[in-house]
Amino acid sequence: MANFIFSAFADEIDSNFEEQLKALKELNIGLIELRGVNGKSFIELSDEEVNAVKEQLDSYGIGISALGTPIGKITVDGDFEAHKKLLTRIMDIGDVLGCKVLRMFSFYPAEGMADDTFKSVVFDYIQQLLEMASARVFIL
């Protein structure tokens, strides 16, 4: 018989992080794909709040399967440099929380952009993100 590892977004259970962890524990789910914490995205947390999240996770014995990031959730004509800075912050948080796996999105095309141009830009953007992530041993 196969063994399965369950992980869940818990911010759809409750916006309160403590309640999320309680529910996961009750359901015997040992991993969370972290996204929302106390009504905001984990990427909006201060360093102190990130440390508190780590303490709560540890106290419940719950690990993180992946960080549910918004990386790639912009149009290709958006501010990619700001997006790269966001990736850096996300990796800083991942280091504190002990999670090296980042969920990401595909990029959205710019209005009127030709398919070949879109494909080329997306491949370039993903290559840049991969270089950043691999330098810090993160998986996109």
What are these regions (language model features)?
Residues M1-N16:
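Boundary/entry segment of secreted carbohydrate-active catalytic domains
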Residues A10, F42-I43, F80, K119:
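A generic secondary-structure micro-motif detector
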Residues N16-E19, Q56-S59, V76-L140:
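Active-site acidic/histidine proton-transfer and metal-coordination neighborhood
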Residues K40-I43, K73-D77:
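Short active-site-adjacent helix-start/loop capping segments
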